[in-house]
Amino acid sequence: MKLSILMPVFNEAETVQNAIKRLLDVQFPCPVEFVVVDDASTDGTSEILDGLHDDRLIKLRHAVNQGKGAAVRTAAAAATGDYIQPFDADMEYQPEDILELLKPVLRGEATVVFGSRTFGSHSAYSFWYVMGNKGVTTVANILFNAYIADLETCFKLMPLELYRSLDITSDGFGMEAEITGKLLARQIRPFEVPITYRARSREEGKKITWKDGVQAVWLLTRIRMTSKRAQRRGIPS
């Protein structure tokens, strides 16, 4: 098994070098590559990436900013691994936790694994932001008769070919809801493991907003309606 870690990067000059160094230092139990996509950064991120060298690094760049979802698609198109794991460059997630997601796959217990965050004392989010995340997750559980703990998590480990077959079209943060919704529509229930999470504040560069939550609910509803129509026609989701 080979793992491809996909890193979308946009204006993360303060954190990207440390994020990549931390990833490179992890002792993975399988061959690994790191596909980094600079989504047309303007803050010096590109120059920092140019100075990083490792045989496991694949560096790509968008000429125009397209969004996180588009950057992940670009990374997945270039990936050569059997499994993929997105990783944000802002260091809200811990690289070492990827090992926890790999364990149930390597034991043969799961095919898709999500890292479930806890919003505790290290979170910079407001009460309403946390409730928004939980609300979107609840909507998904109701629509698809499922029970998952954290729909919006970045930590989604799955086979590369499964990701490609989902045909994700969201260019921005909506990719998280689209991936989860399309998995649930196929009756694929992710195995979940707890992970460490330390949220950034708006002042530190957090980019996601309440509008992304509204979009997530819309995407989930659309996917569910499309899935029900396909089921009535006898077409696989």
Language model regions located:
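Catalytic donor-sugar/metal-binding loop of nucleotide-sugar-dependent glycosyltransferases
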Residues: 147, 169-171, 181-198
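Acceptor/aglycone-binding surface of glycosyltransferases and processive sugar-polymer synthases
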Residues: 64-78, 83, 95-173, 199-219, ...
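Cell-envelope/extracellular polymer assembly enzymes that use nucleotide-activated donors
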Residues: 2-4, 33, 178
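Conserved donor nucleotide-binding strand/loop of the catalytic core
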Residues: 32-33, 46-78
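A conserved acidic beta->alpha catalytic loop
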Residues: 38-47, 91
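Short, well-formed alpha-helical segments that are part of the catalytic scaffolds
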Residues: 12-26
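Acidic helix N-cap motif at the loop->helix transition within catalytic regions
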Residues: 14-18, 43-51
